[in-house]
Amino acid sequence: VIGTEPALKPAVEKYPGGRILVMATPMTIKQEKFQALKHQFDDRAQIIGLPCEGLMEFVERGELRGSAVAAYLTEKLAPYLREPVDGIVLGCTHYPFLTGAIRRIVGPGPEIMDGSHGVAMQLERKLAQSGMLRQCGEPGTAVFENSLDEPEILAR
């Protein structure tokens, strides 16, 4: 099992002393694990946790753009954009699907970061350690599983 965590470390390393907004589910923001991670970097940057109740559901419904998601993001982000933001960390595995919608709201300024690169690197290390990392140059196969019962949403 490979756990995910918000990409706070890379954000703080890239923007020391910067203002970093972490968009995550309310549960993630409240969790002791997140609070400990935030505390680890509190002295190196201004880290602001933004609980985004309901944002994950936009992704699950396949609503990645449009007026409803734009209104939601504007309402959530506008109060934090009154001052410059250096980085926005996407603290939920669903949120990278909304990168384009978030970019349209925040403009070109803040860098939008997620933890997918770190997860991929950890997966590669674990597969190599267990001798399961594919070494040949031939293409492999991928199997995607989803409990969603709506093929038209999955097709997007």
Give residue spans per PLM region.
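Non-catalytic structural scaffold of enzyme domains
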Residues: 1-156
